[in-house]
Each structure stands twice: as structure tokens, then as C-alpha cells.
């Protein structure tokens, strides 16, 4: 619970990418990104290690890898341009770096939506990082 409170406080002042990512997750899944994905498995939330535990956790692994490939801007803070057209997220703007951040977030939000049935809160919500010791696979 303390972790959620800290994250909520941190997000209050955020107007950049993490806030936008939360909106995209909500739009695609109907779920709160902070409440559903901030402390799930080995990769959802801050940092990540080991092997993804299920398809939902793999969405976070792929998202982390995607952010790792972004250069020239800050994936967690920079604001990007997007719209939602007929239920689809469309990344816009002319800045290629910010567009890449948007595409990372878009892909993750869609992945969460497509894998809602794999979400296992009883097993993987607040999953102890000490159980994420397997060797990580490459991005």
C-alpha cells in the first residue's frame, strides 16, 4: 500500500509521459495503469529483472526494452502527441523521439488489453523481486 501511495504522490505532479501512459492503458483496458500494472510480476513497475512471469508481465518487459531503444529524449517524462480515433491510439507530432515513446506506450497498452485474461493478481501482484532471479532474456 505504501508503494501505491508513493507512486500516487509522484504522479500528481507529472504531466508528461507517465501520465499519458496511464491514460492510454485506461483507454485500452478500462483499468488503472497505476493500480493494475505498477507492481506486477518481475517487469511491471520501476525496474525489471529475471524472466517475465506471464503474458502481462511480458508486455512490461517489451515496454522496458522499447524504452531502452529510445535515444535523444526522456521516455518517462517527455510529452508526446497522440489521439484516439475509432478506439485506436494514433501517435502524432513531428519529433521522432517523442513519436517513438508514444509507439512504445501504444504497443504496451494494446498488449495489456490483448492479455487481460492472463492477469493473475493472486500470484503476481506485488510479486517479490527476490523471486525474479532467473537470467533475463535479451530484448
Curated annotation (Swiss-Prot):
GO MF terms on file? calcium ion binding; calcium-dependent phospholipase A2 activity; phospholipid binding
> Which reaction is catalysed here?
a 1,2-diacyl-sn-glycero-3-phosphocholine + H2O = a 1-acyl-sn-glycero-3-phosphocholine + a fatty acid + H(+)
Assigned EC number: 3.1.1.4
**S-S pairs:** 42-139, 44-60, 59-111, 65-139, 66-104, 73-97, 91-102
Q: How is it modified after translation?
A: Acylation causes dimerization.
| Lipid-attached positions, N6-palmitoyl lysine | 23, 26
Q: Where in the cell is it found?
A: Secreted
Q: Which GO terms describe its cellular component?
A: extracellular region
Which positions in this protein are listed as binding Ca(2+)? 43, 45, 47, 64
- The active site lies at 63, 105
Its chief place of residence is secreted
How and how many cofactors are bound, per the record note?
Binds 1 Ca(2+) ion per subunit.
Which superkingdom, per the lineage? Eukaryota
Coiled-coil regions listed: none
- Keyword terms of this UniProt record: Calcium, Disulfide bond, Hydrolase, Lipid degradation, Lipid metabolism, Lipoprotein, Metal-binding, Palmitate, Secreted, Signal
Expression sites (tissue/organ): Expressed by the venom gland.
Q: Which PROSITE patterns match?
A: PA2_ASP (PS00119), PA2_HIS (PS00118)
**Swiss-Prot/TrEMBL cofactor(s):** Ca(2+)
Record bears the keyword Transferase: no
GO BP, one example? arachidonate secretion
Tell me where the signal peptide lies: 1-16
- PANTHER family named in the record: PHOSPHOLIPASE A2 FAMILY MEMBER (PTHR11716), PHOSPHOLIPASE A2, MEMBRANE ASSOCIATED (PTHR11716:SF9)
The role this protein plays is: Snake venom phospholipase A2 (PLA2) that does not show antibacterial activity. PLA2 catalyzes the calcium-dependent hydrolysis of the 2-acyl groups in 3-sn-phosphoglycerides.
Assembly state and interactors?
Answer: Monomer or homodimer.
What family does the Swiss-Prot or TrEMBL record give for this protein?
A: Belongs to the phospholipase A2 family. Group II subfamily. D49 sub-subfamily.
Q: What is this protein called?
A: Basic phospholipase A2 APL-D49
Q: Which organism is it from?
A: Agkistrodon piscivorus leucostoma (Western cottonmouth)
Amino acid at each position: 500500500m505504501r508503494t501505491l501511495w508513493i507512486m500516487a504522490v509522484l504522479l500528481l505532479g507529472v504531466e508528461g509521459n507517465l501520465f499519458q501512459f496511464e491514460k492510454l492503458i485506461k483507454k485500452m483496458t478500462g483499468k488503472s495503469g497505476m493500480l493494475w500494472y505498477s507492481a506486477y510480476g518481475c517487469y511491471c513497475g520501476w525496474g525489471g529483472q529475471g524472466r517475465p512471469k506471464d503474458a502481462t508481465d511480458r508486455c512490461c518487459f517489451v515496454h522496458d526494452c522499447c524504452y531502452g531503444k529510445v535515444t535523444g529524449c526522456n521516455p518517462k517524462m517527455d510529452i508526446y502527441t497522440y489521439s484516439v480515433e475509432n478506439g485506436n491510439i494514433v501517435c502524432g507530432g513531428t519529433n521522432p523521439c517523442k513519436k517513438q515513446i508514444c509507439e512504445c506506450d501504444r504497443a504496451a497498452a494494446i498488449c495489456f488489453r490483448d492479455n487481460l485474461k492472463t492477469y493473475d493478481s493472486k500470484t503476481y501482484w506485488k510479486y517479490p523481486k527476490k523471486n525474479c532471479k532467473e537470467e533475463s532474456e535479451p530484448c
